[in-house]
Design a protein with these regions (language model features):
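Nucleotide/pyrophosphate-binding catalytic subdomain
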Residues: 1-197
Length: 197
């Protein structure tokens, strides 16, 4: 199978018009006979809003509940992308980490992906479907939602590309390349020329 993983960041899915554009990009890959796996971040600002709400509830919000809360933004974006693809006549559905499952280990807020069950997604791809997978999240051995840390949707996409032997992993973002820190926030950010995972 010729698989491509497309990852869309918060800016790319930040408005309904941008989500419509994302659907057009996905459709172009489908037309070129790719089996497309999509990984989405939350819409721009959604995660920060959820983090702020957790702090308003209490200063020491439970790490376990924090992961449940902040991972919900990806669910919204995935559903909107899938809905737009369906409107365009493309078989699609959103997938959360527990539905696949994407297995993680480590602490809440800072877990890492250690395995992905490929079976459901492979069947879905073979049926012509486009899975829209929530980035940034997984489930641990206790079946609790965990997050991979800020920027974790990129890590999710890269790991999914690895587990599914994708031909390419393309990350759509609002910066050109990988930087030492967010270049939109710090002018001193340096672009990394070569990186491995």
């Amino acid at each position: 199978m010729k698989i491509v993983v497309l990852k869309f960041g918060g800016t790319s899915v930040g408005t309904i018009d941008k989500i419509k554009n994302v659907a057009n990009i996905i459709n172009d890959y489908k037309k070129n006979k790719y089996k497309v796996i999509v990984v989405s971040s939350a819409m721009k600002g959604a995660t920060n809003d959820l983090v702020r709400k957790s702090r308003e509830i209490c200063e020491n919000f439970s790490d376990e509940e924090y992961d449940v809360l902040v991972s919900s933004g990806e669910q919204v974006a995935c559903s909107l992308i899938a809905g737009r693809l369906i409107k365009k006549g493309i078989k699609s559905r959103s997938w959360l980490a527990w539905q696949i499952p994407i297995l993680t280990e480590g602490l809440h807020k800072h877990s890492r992906i250690n395995n992905v069950n490929r079976n459901k997604i492979i069947r879905y791809l073979k049926s012509g479907g486009v899975p829209i997978i929530a980035g940034f999240q997984g489930i641990n051995k206790e079946q609790r939602i965990t997050t991979i840390g800020r920027g974790g949707s990129d890590a999710s996409a890269i790991m999914l590309a690895k587990f599914f032997n994708a031909k390419r992993c393309i990350i759509y973002t609002d910066v050109e390349g990988v930087y030492t820190t967010d270049p939109n926030k710090l002018k001193k950010a340096k672009k990394i020329k070569v990186i491995s995972y």
